[in-house]
Amino acid sequence: MIRLFAAFPLPEIISADLSRRQKGILGARWRPLESLHVTLRFFGPLPENKADDLDSELSAISGRTFDLSLEGVGVFGEGVDVHAVWAGMAPNEPLMQLARQCERAARRAGLAREMRAYRPHVTLAYLRNASTDEVGAWVQQNNLLKSPSFLISRFGLYSSWPGENGAVYRLERPYSLS
C-alpha cells in the first residue's frame, strides 16, 4: 500500500514568504519549506495496481497552465479543536477545474468519491494543544496575506511517508499542463 495524493509545489519565492510567517504559535509543528504544496485530491493508501490505474488516469488529464495567488489564512477545526493553520488561494476557476479533473480520474480508477468539499490551501502547521489566543493572534497578523501571482504548469502524484518530523512527500509521477 502506498499513500498518495495529487498536488503541485509552490515556487521557492512563495514558500520562502510563507516560511517567514511560520512562528508565533507554541505547539505548532510548522511544515518544512520543501513540504509546502497545494493538494488537488487526497487518494489515501492504495495497492500498487490501483496506483498504476490512477497514474494512467491522471496522465490523461489535459489542461492549460494558469496563474494563481495566495490569499488569506485560516484554520481547520474550531475552538480548542483547531488542528491546523493554512494559507488560502485567491478564487481561481482553472484550479477548481484541475481539482475536478483529479476527482474524475480517481473515480475512473475505481476510487470512492471524495465527500468533503474541495478547499484549496497550503497547510503551514499542524497544531497540538495550541493556545486559542495565539492561534487567533496569528490569524489576525496574517489574514491580509496576498502573494504575487505565480504560474502553475505542472502537478504530480505524490506519496507520503512517515518521517521523524512529520510526513515526507515524494514526487512519484509528474504531469504537465500545456
Specify the residue positions occupied by each region the protein language model found.
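Histidine-dependent nucleotide/RNA phosphoesterase domain, centered on the 2H-phosphoesterase fold
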Residues: 1-178
